[in-house]
Amino acid sequence: MSTTLAKPAEMADRKWYVIDAAGKPLGRVAAKAAVILRGKNKTTFTPNVDCGDHVIIINCDEAVLTGKKLEKKFHRTHSGWIGRLKETQYKTLMAENSDKAMTYAVKGMVPSNTIGTKAMTRLHCYKAADHAHAAQKPEAVEI
């Protein structure tokens, strides 16, 4: 039995998908976006080829965190210098930069290599319902 592998030239035609995050858990939206960005929803998925599609996430302001995660969960960044750990509570992160919170969640779900880096360039997060990609005619994805 032979396995058909996708070639990078075959993956040039990428689709656009839009996900509405209003009232949905942040992690579930991020997980669905990561699957599409990686290309795992396709029958022609090949692990060493970047075969993912574009994902637009709208209404990031209305995404919810379940339980007590708003108060107890932190986003941590470290500059590499001693004592330079910065912690941001998700309550303030969701209030100020909800699109960044969604981006951080998706980034943690894609591989940390060149394919994951390319996949993250195809992620477009917006706080409100309007976006600048209507000309691409994105398909709606239900969660």
Sequence positions of predicted segments:
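C-terminal structural segments of small proteins and small subunits
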Residues: 103, 110-132
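Ribosome large-subunit tunnel/peptidyl-transferase-proximal elements
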Residues: 1-104, 114, 132-143
